Amino acid sequence: MAYKNASSPHQKQRRTTSQVMVLVILCLIPGVFLQSYFFGYANLIQISLACLAALASEAFILKIRNRPVLNTLKDASALLTAILLAISIPPLAPWWIVVIGTIFAIIFVKQIYGGLGQNIFNPAMAGYVLLLISFPVQMTSWLPVQSLQPFSLTLMDQINAIFTGSTLDGYSVAQLSVSIDGLSMATPLNTVRDALHNGFTVTEIFNSVQFKASSWQQIYWINGAFLAGGLILLFKRIVHWHIPMSFLLGIGIFSFIAFAYSPDLNAPPLFHLFSGATMLGAFFILSDPVSASTTVKGRILYALLIAFIVVIIRNVGGYPDAVAFAVLLGNMCVPLIDYYTQPKVYGGRK
């Protein structure tokens, strides 16, 4: 057997928490860039507001708990939570939406449970669910892509819309959510769900004007960008393959079963894989090492469970996308999954 000679030192240095968080944030850049390119720069404003709220709220609660403030803030975990939440909400949502969600995520989901490494729920998704349930109108006011927007929005228009609810010319967010053909803007998942409830088949929906105006091509590109960033995380071994690959495989299998059973009432697997927050969830949310399962078998079961819930809610639930709800339900099951998937210790009794 041939052995490879390598110079010392042979013990590799482990990455620090801050290095891991920063690398994850960097891998989010392709998806964030395409969001800005297709829908405007308002999402960057939301990210800035969320980061400020995250740092301020974490510093506040750390001060109350008599914990070191600067050293904790340097780990960048609060910034990652803020960015994940900010890119999940509509770009022109009121400024207080992202602030409330971020404060809730940092204080009530992360710090009250003991801080980084102790929270049982994913903070960003818990904050998102709080906002979606509490403010459904603001959380579903999506913009058309810039090529279909009836008004040309400058950066100042977007800033003004976020802080006052209207552009410099007086157009409200509701008016901005209507494309040039007069159709109210909705995500592809929204469009498919609403049309199915109205009795249309999947084939009719995909050929409809409403679906073609729902920016589905841009959403596919954005998911592809998050997939590219996720593959970098896999290559760097920041994320193990078990969770993202099992989740995507589960989405494909479960959606294929539903599509094969009733192709007129269920979207095909490719649509599910590249719509909504599928790729963002697979590589950046489910793979959270704190709230996910810790065993190899457990990670696979955890990801498959979430994939199953996502497909079920998308097909028959009341919400178009279900990644956030599915992740929180999966987080609840982690202790049980870990209990029954612990590897047998050599020499131990079964």
Curated annotation (Swiss-Prot):
> Which UniProt key words apply to this protein?
Cell inner membrane, Cell membrane, Electron transport, Flavoprotein, FMN, Membrane, Phosphoprotein, Translocase, Transmembrane, Transmembrane helix, Transport
Its EC number is 7.-.-.-
Q: Which cofactor does it need?
A: FMN
UniProt topology in membrane: Multi-pass membrane protein
Q: Which domain of life is it from?
A: Bacteria
Residues spanning the membrane: 20-40, 44-64, 68-88, 89-109, 125-145, 215-235, 241-261, 267-287, 300-320, 322-342
List the subcellular locations. Cell inner membrane
A Pfam family annotated for this UniProt entry: NQR2_RnfD_RnfE
Bridged cysteine pairs (disulfide): none
Assigned GO CC terms: plasma membrane
Q: What is its main location?
A: membrane
> Per the record's keyword annotation, is Repeat included, yes or no?
no
BP GO annotations: electron transport chain; transmembrane transport
- In this UniProt entry, the residues modified to FMN phosphoryl threonine are 187
Question: Its biological function?
Answer: Part of a membrane-bound complex that couples electron transfer with translocation of ions across the membrane.
Similarity field:
Belongs to the NqrB/RnfD family.
Its subunit composition reads: The complex is composed of six subunits: RnfA, RnfB, RnfC, RnfD, RnfE and RnfG.
Q: What is this protein called?
A: Ion-translocating oxidoreductase complex subunit D
Native organism taxonomy: Bacteria, Pseudomonadati, Pseudomonadota, Gammaproteobacteria, Alteromonadales
